[in-house]
Amino acid sequence: MTLTTATSGAIVFSGATLLVSLFAAASLYSQVSNIWNELDAEIANFRSLTEDMWVDMVKLGAGTASNRVRRQQYGGYGATGVQPPAPTPNPYGGYGASQPAPPEKFPDGIPNGGNQPKFPGGGFPDGPFPNGGGPRGGNQCQCTVENSCPPGPAGPEGEEGPDGHDGQDGVPGFDGKDAEDVQNTPPTGCFTCPQGPLGPQGPNGAPGLRGMRGARGQPGRPGRDGNPGMPGDCGPPGAPGSDGKPGSPGGKGDDGERPLGRPGPRGPPGEAGPEGPQGPTGRDAYPGQSGPQGEPGLQGYGGAAGEDGPEGPPGAPGLPGKDAEYCKCPGREGDAGRSARRHRKFQL
């Protein structure tokens, strides 16, 4: 492949890629425009529905003064409109008012049917116990010594006590005043609806125009020094430098000391050397001392018959024998010599 062919192929590929990119950009722009148009139509439809709902709510009488008195009393989000003055609270505190202490006697001019309750002292009791204290019980300890002991463990749960006595009937209430006439009038102010939940996040908008160039910023802080790098490779050896000037003779050094070291520990034995040549035959050793006599051995086998010994000297003449009788034939000479040698061996 030549250089011209490679260049032509790269140009054709780049052109095709550029055309595909332009087509994709146009398609994306068209899709984004369609989405914007759909969103605008949905928003317009939502606004029209909201206006219709508001008209219906106004026709139904929502937000009028007669329907918002109660909410105003509890501190709602507030509606503006013509409202009649709120009814004054009664002397004992009514709807939305604080509760004052009950009077000692009924006010003058308030009908009670002539049946005023009779309590000790001619008025209302101050509390559940007239004496202002707790329920009557036994003698109570008035000690002032502080008990620093830790509390003991909780005891077992006691038995259920008897039911208490029924309380006294309460004082009859006063008759309420007649309410004033209320007329439904259309609202004269804006109706503020509560803020609804957040909707889903919309698509990213188109990039806006480039803003004006801002002022030049302050110079940044100087950067920190970087970490030391890895050591580089050794360079080639440099050329030898010129010889320096001879230095001045140094001062006389101190006398040297030759320490005498102690002999070190004995080293391990070395390996065996090669076998040397055979030496000359040594002299015969002196005969050693005779060892102790051993135990007698077992009787050996009979040896071969030895040679006949020399004939001995003639013996002395014997004594006269007995009368002649029949005698056996004399034995052979060989048998007599063998028996004699055997007799000598046993003696040894």
UniProtKB/Swiss-Prot annotation:
A Pfam family reported for this protein in Swiss-Prot or TrEMBL:
Collagen
Q: Where is the composition biased (Basic and acidic residues)?
A: 322-338
Cellular component GO terms, alphabetical: collagen trimer; cuticular extracellular matrix
Q: Which UniProt keywords apply?
A: Collagen, Cuticle, Disulfide bond, Repeat
Gene Ontology molecular function, alphabetical:
structural constituent of collagen and cuticulin-based cuticle
Described by its record, this protein's role is as follows:
Nematode cuticles are composed largely of collagen-like proteins. The cuticle functions both as an exoskeleton and as a barrier to protect the worm from its environment. May play a role in cuticle remodeling in response to the environment. Involved in body morphogenesis.
**Similarity section:** Belongs to the cuticular collagen family.
Task: Indicate what this protein is called per its UniProt record.
Answer: Cuticle collagen rol-6
Give the source species. Answer: Caenorhabditis elegans
